Amino acid sequence: AEGCPVSGREAQLGYLLQKGCYTACAWNKAVRRELFSSCDLRFREGVTSEDIDWCARLALAAKSFGLSACRFYRYRQRTGSITRTMNLKSLRDLKENIELCLRLPQEMGASTAIKELYWSYVAYQFGTFLVCAPSVNGPEGRGLVQEMREKRWLLRYNAASRKVQLLYVVDRLLGYRALCLLCRGYAAIRK
C-alpha cells in the first residue's frame, strides 16, 4: 500500500501499530467505500469512545493499509470531550468497547498473526481505561476497575506503547491492586 514501507497485511498493520500510527480515531483514516457495506463499518450510537470498536473492526477487516504523512485535518477538542473529562457513563462505555474488541477477532475470523498484532491495539485501550478510571470517584468506578482485572493479560502486548509497557511492569512487580493505586495517585497529580 502507498506510503507504507512494508508489504503484506500483517507487516503493514504491525508497522502502523508499532509506530503509533494506527490509533483509535476515525478522523485520520481514509477507507474504501466497499468496506463500509461489506464489513458493517457504522458507528454505534449512544456510546462514547465509539471510534475504538470502529477502528478495531477496520483493523480486522482491511486487506491492506497505507500511510500518508500529509496533514489534511485539524482536530479541535471540545471542553466536554471524553479525552478531557471522564465520568461514569464514559468509563462504562470504554469498558464495553474493550470487551467488544476482545470478541471481535473470533467473530470476524481473524488469523492468529493478525490477533497477535491486534491485541496491542486493545492493550492501549485497556491502559487508557486504567489511567482514566481513577477520575471517576465512588464505588461504581472502583467496581468497574475490579471487573476488568481479568483482562490485565492484555498488558503483555505492550511493544507499541510506553504507557502500556509501564503498566505491565508495575502489574508484574507489584500486582494489580498496587497498579490501580498508582493510577489513582497519577490521576490526583494530573488534576
Regions flagged by a language model, labelled:
Residues 71-79, 84-112, 128, 132-155:
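Catalytic core of nucleotide-sugar-dependent glycosyltransferases
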Residues 110-120, 168-169, 173:
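Structural motif
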Residues 117-131:
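Amphipathic alpha-helical repeat scaffolds of TPR domains
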Residues 67-68, 116:
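A structural signal for short, well-ordered beta-strand segments and their strand-loop junctions
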Residues 135-191:
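Membrane-interface aromatic/basic loop that binds lipid-linked glycans or pyrophosphate carriers
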